[in-house]
């Protein structure tokens, strides 16, 4: 029985994108794509890759401005706001650094 408990405790969390975060990302990518489609795709790929890495080290980034969240900066201008529990990392928002948050 102890062995099963150890496996559950050491399980890697899953990644869950909230609807608001997906909408944020799409809005950012579409805005950039108007001038530079390649840069938009590169940014999208980087944000998605960095977000995927959060399941391995979810507590790596600083506490967020809202209690219970953390914030990961991507390319100095974008902030991925997320929360985590034992089983899931929730991507809550993807924001430009100039946006008012919260």
Give the ranges of each region predicted by the language model.
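Conserved amphipathic alpha-helical interaction elements at protein-protein interfaces in regulatory
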Residues: 31-34, 53-56, 60
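Arg/Lys-rich, positively charged N-terminal/basic patches that mediate binding to nucleic acids
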Residues: 1-41
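Generic leucine side-chain signal with a strong bias for well-ordered alpha-helical environments
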Residues: 15, 25, 43, 54, ...
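Short, well-structured alpha-helical segments
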Residues: 41-44, 48
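Basic/aromatic recognition patch in beta-strand/loop cores that engages polyanionic ligands
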Residues: 56-87
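Enriched for short, Lys/Arg-rich terminal
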Residues: 6, 78-79, 83-102
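Generic recognition of well-ordered alpha-helical segments
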Residues: 23, 27, 49-52, 56
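GIY-YIG nuclease signature motif recognition
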Residues: 21, 47, 82
């Amino acid at each position: 029985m102890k062995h099963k408990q150890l496996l559950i405790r050491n399980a890697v969390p899953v990644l869950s994108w909230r609807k608001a975060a997906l909408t944020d990302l799409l809005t950012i990518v579409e805005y950039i794509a108007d001038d530079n489609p390649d840069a938009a795709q590169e940014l999208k790929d980087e944000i998605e890759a960095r977000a995927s890495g959060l399941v391995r080290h979810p507590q790596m980034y600083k506490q967020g401005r809202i209690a219970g969240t953390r914030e990961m900066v991507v390319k100095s201008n974008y902030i991925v706001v997320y929360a985590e529990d034992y089983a899931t990392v929730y991507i809550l928002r993807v924001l430009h650094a100039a946006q008012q948050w919260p």
